[in-house]
Amino acid sequence: MGEMPFWKMKSLEEMSGAEWESLCDGCGLCCLNKLEDWDSSEIAWTSIRCTLLDGESCRCRDYDNRQATVPDCIQLTPEAVREISWLPPTCGYRLVSEGRDLYWWHPLVSGDPETVHAAGISVRGRTVPEDDIDIEDYEDYLVTWPLEVGREPAE
């Protein structure tokens, strides 16, 4: 019987830098532009991606320096994970902070970074870059798929 995975044994605060980074499944959902209703505080997702998000790999093109280019980019910390209401329901950070397990398609479980895409979780092929969209047109790009959990593995 194997050793229990680190995300089941450690709190977010106890994780090493490498363990913390590996909780990211590479879906790209957190890098989508979101709209917030000022009255209700409800969050609406768009299919508009951050200027730095690669639409195919679903990874940041300049991760280490992203906040220099995108000053409002959110740096996730254990505290931020617990406070940010818009993290997708499939987010590894959110799941672990809530004491839940990772989904089968998470690369830490599957051993394959492509399963997040095969399961239909990632933004791959479903987004447009924010540089191409006028902010007044963002409502034309509202989507609900970031709130879906994805497909089960094929038998």
From Swiss-Prot:
<protein>
    <recommendedName>
        <fullName>UPF0260 protein Smed_0627</fullName>
    </recommendedName>
</protein>
<dbReference type="InterPro" id="IPR005358">
    <property type="entry name" value="Puta_zinc/iron-chelating_dom"/>
</dbReference>
<comment type="similarity">
    <text>Belongs to the UPF0260 family.</text>
</comment>
<dbReference type="Pfam" id="PF03692">
    <property type="entry name" value="CxxCxxCC"/>
</dbReference>
<dbReference type="InterPro" id="IPR008228">
    <property type="entry name" value="UCP006173"/>
</dbReference>
